[in-house]
Design a protein with these regions (language model features):
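Retroelement reverse transcriptase polymerase core
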Residues: 1-158
Length: 158
């Protein structure tokens, strides 16, 4: 069955004059690293190399350093429940004014780093099964979880 699917994909690529570079292809793998993610049989996970990189990230001393950290963690926000709520003390520092680092920012910084070490493997959606959406909101943020069979597919927050 795998070989039939592979042949079908390669045939469609060829029909449309697209070509796969053999040196960039991996066939028959049970997992693969792709764009900072690990694609597994069970679903999608954060690349452990990126997690280690985040854990070593020093406390930002400038707005550009903070933007870099938030950019990296924000890329993985779909893996972190209530990301927006956890990151709010840090995103508040991006507003105009003098850059100062309060205790709440230190707590948020460490909370996000810890959250990155405990991210779940997100399930791949099965469009033949029902989806469940759980929502939570307050006056300052909103969060939601999309899941199937009690397995998260993605987390959303703002």
């Amino acid at each position: 069955e795998y070989l039939q699917h592979l042949e079908a994909v390669l045939s469609v690529l060829q029909q449309h004059q697209f070509f796969a570079n053999h040196s960039k292809c991996s066939f028959g793998q049970s997992q693969i690293q792709y764009l900072g993610h690990m694609i597994l049989e069970e679903g999608v996970a954060v690349d452990p190399i990126k997690v280690q990189y985040m854990l070593q990230w020093p406390q930002p001393k400038t707005i550009s350093g903070l933007r870099g950290f938030l950019g990296l963690t924000g890329y993985y926000r779909r893996f972190i429940r209530d990301y927006g709520k956890k990151a709010k003390p840090l995103t508040d520092l991006l507003k105009k004014g003098n850059f100062s680092w309060p205790e709440a920012a230190t707590t948020a910084f460490e909370t996000l780093k810890l959250a990155m070490t405990t991210t779940p493997v997100l399930a791949l959606p099965d469009f033949n099964q029902p989806f469940i959406i759980e929502c939570d909101a307050s006056g300052t943020w909103i969060g939601a979880v999309l899941s199937q069979n009690k397995h998260p597919i993605a987390f959303f927050s703002k």
